[in-house]
Amino acid sequence: MTEIKERGDRMEEACGVFGIYAQDEAINVAEAAYYGLFALQHRGQESAGIAVADGKGIKHYRNLGLVPEVFDEEILHGLTGHISIGHVRYSTFGGKDVINAQPLVARCKIGMLALAHNGNLVNADALRSQMEDDGAIFQTTVDTEVILSLIARESSKGLIEAVRSMMEKVRGSYALVLLAKDKLIGIRDPYGIRPLCLGRVGSSFVLASESCALDAVGAEFVRDVQPGEIVVIDEEGIHSTHVKTPMRSRLCLFEFVYFARPDSVIDGINVYQSRVEAGKRLAVGDDVQADMVIGVPDSALAAAMGYAQQSGIPYGDGLAKNRYVGRTFIQPEQGMRELGVRTKLNALTRNVRGKRLILVDDSIVRGTTSRKIVEMLRTAGAKEVHMRISSPSVLNPCYFGIDTATSEELIGHSRSVEEICRFIGADSLKFLSLPDLLKTVAGSGCQFCTGCFDGDYPIDPETGEMKDIEE
């Protein structure tokens, strides 16, 4: 069952996945996975894990914590082989227990398998119940185990056919890296909701949630895994097959607003440039008088720079970030979360005192963090604070791998822009429109899931019905 958790004023990414098949014996695949996961740490901070295959079996290690907290040289030294996969997790389905950390490992008729998953299934409970009625026993509460169990049950037909069978049954988002004793497989859901890319370093191949992880291990970007594609890497090289896909892909638009690292390129779109363009479009037609544009570090800085470039208002630093403080959303009580905001961010008093500020952030979820930041800037002597958001108001929950508040907790679901402005204490508030946000990622040929903004989900979260399917 999906666990309902108290979270802070951010939409948080669920997971990051990484895999490498080394043809070069000089490559230490456990170390490569470590550095790849470190580059993807922004996608999950609750747990980390690595599984390694040596042609005979699979060894793995996973635990709660950040990548450098989970792994040391001794642990990595014990993970020997020529293929590895890794995972960083932020739970959206299932609890935080170490048993839910990934990769998950299972033994089936063709040997051991390990699986790492970024995404979320909307029919996981129904599938789990059906399999339990058939006698299946589940060890975890995560939907990843449902996927792995479906593959294992059909594995006697061949691993690729088992994957195809799984893809016919599950509904939701998934970017998967699957490890067998002699192969690495990358799988992307038919809508391509979650990102997955392919890279190459020498004669070895790499799979990762974002291209920044390829850079971290010295791999060259080859291409993105396509929606509905199954990429198989083994001793014969790389080959792929596809399942039937919808008429439109639906990549998560919020990847470009907040989740992805700015140095990544996803489905041909430069994340940093898309954020700068969002800031520029946010400034068009905005006639507010101000002395300085500042951004909330780190995800809103590119948009703030874009706003400054378009408006002609000078860009400056107004907030300092303590990078050694845990994220505010992990605090269980509202009072502790608000204390966490003050500990994590602090106003640069000399920079903001007496100034009329344009404060740019990427999104507002509950509004509590925005209110604290506005209050902080006013306490530091800011004369005016005009908040500008480089995305539309978040009106609906995400069902496809992002941890969001419920509809009732989303401030944009029940309050107008004017009411939100009063709640956060800003002098004015403006959101980027959805058409303008879509223009920041235009030209790639991609289409996007915009459900959190307008309710247009590619899959019905209640029934699992898929849209845009040819009869």
Q: What role is predicted for each listed range?
A:
Residues 92-93, 123, 193-194, 214-215, ...:
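Flexible loop/turn segments at secondary-structure boundaries
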Residues 346-360, 364, 389, 461-462, ...:
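Mobile, glycine- and charge-enriched loop segments
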